[in-house]
């Protein structure tokens, strides 16, 4: 059975959280922070789709000239090839105001308890969009895909997930993951298992190594980047870690590992008898 990285993340946070969510199927309510983060991701996905839309006609013209040859070229590689020829996606349609409008269309307000809190979150999102636009405008960008799904084999397991944004750079492929949480340290980014999985996914999708993994943290104070790479040995270690976690899942090892940090973020802390908070 395929497993998403979010399932691996829940198990790593606490095996009981995984058990409640994926084995016992106990529902949980989405928090205001999760709702806000989801709205930000939707807005940036639509922004990336707007970028891609500006190149669709040109890509179609060039691939049509390839005739029957294009049938043997994967769609992902065609998009990457397109990125090699179009480094600058900035145009009159890609403005800060258009991004704000996309945010208004993407923002989900009904998870907030009051209209005041919803309005505050909406205005906060506007500021985050401005911060993102300032970051985005710094250099020409060539987006290859947004919210790109993947499915890769890790030993006997299938692991699925989505890449927030993929860009083509002069060096190769850059994977960008958006965050609305507090920034992690550089050491945490360098050791992050999710980013290692993303590097494996990029190599699978494009038949070439990922040259940069970038965590982009969006906050009221601005944007914070955590850029990292993965070596062959790190990718091998990531495969081993994921397989070991899968084996523990299959062995039904759901012994809880409570901690203040994990329990504070757990949606099941109200029903768990060993919750640390």
Name every feature range the model reports, one short phrase each.
Residues 148-241:
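Mg2+/Mn2+-dependent nuclease catalytic core
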Residues 39-50, 244, 248:
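Solvent-exposed, amphipathic alpha-helical segments
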Residues 1-34:
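C-terminal, charged and often intrinsically disordered regions of DNA end-processing helicases
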Residues 43-147, 153:
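A non-catalytic, helix-rich entry segment at domain boundaries
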Residues 275-277:
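Short cysteine/histidine-rich zinc-coordinating motifs and their immediately flanking basic loops
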Residues 32, 36, 40, 121, ...:
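Hydrophobic (often cysteine-bearing) scaffold residues that line and stabilize catalytic clefts
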Residues 234-267:
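Polybasic (Lys/Arg-rich)
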Residues 14, 263-266, 272:
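Short cysteine clusters
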């Amino acid at each position: 059975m395929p497993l998403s990285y979010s399932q691996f993340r829940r198990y790593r946070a606490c095996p009981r959280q995984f058990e409640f969510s994926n084995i016992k199927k106990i529902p949980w309510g989405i928090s205001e922070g999760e709702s806000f983060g989801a709205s930000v991701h939707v807005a940036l996905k639509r922004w990336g789709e707007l970028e891609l839309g500006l190149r669709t006609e040109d890509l179609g013209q060039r691939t049509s000239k390839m005739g029957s040859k294009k049938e043997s070229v994967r769609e992902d590689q065609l998009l990457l090839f397109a990125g090699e020829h179009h480094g600058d996606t900035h145009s009159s349609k890609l403005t800060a105001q258009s991004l704000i409008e996309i945010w208004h269309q993407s923002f989900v307000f009904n998870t907030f308890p009051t209209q005041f809190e919803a309005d505050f979150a909406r205005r906060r999102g506007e500021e985050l969009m401005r911060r993102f636009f300032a970051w985005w405008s710094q250099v020409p960008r060539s987006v290859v895909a947004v919210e790109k799904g993947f499915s890769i084999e890790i030993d006997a397991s299938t692991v699925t997930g989505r890449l927030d944004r993929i860009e083509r750079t002069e060096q190769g492929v850059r994977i960008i993951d958006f965050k609305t949480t507090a920034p992690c340290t550089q050491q945490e980014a360098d050791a992050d298992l999710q980013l290692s999985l993303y590097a494996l996914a990029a190599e699978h999708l494009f038949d070439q190594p990922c040259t940069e993994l970038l965590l982009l943290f969006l906050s009221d104070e601005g944007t914070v980047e955590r850029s990292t790479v993965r070596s062959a040995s790190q990718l091998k270690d990531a495969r081993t870690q994921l397989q070991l976690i899968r084996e523990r899942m299959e062995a039904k090892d759901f012994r809880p590992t409570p901690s203040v940090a994990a329990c504070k973020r757990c949606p099941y802390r109200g029903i768990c008898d060993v919750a640390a908070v």
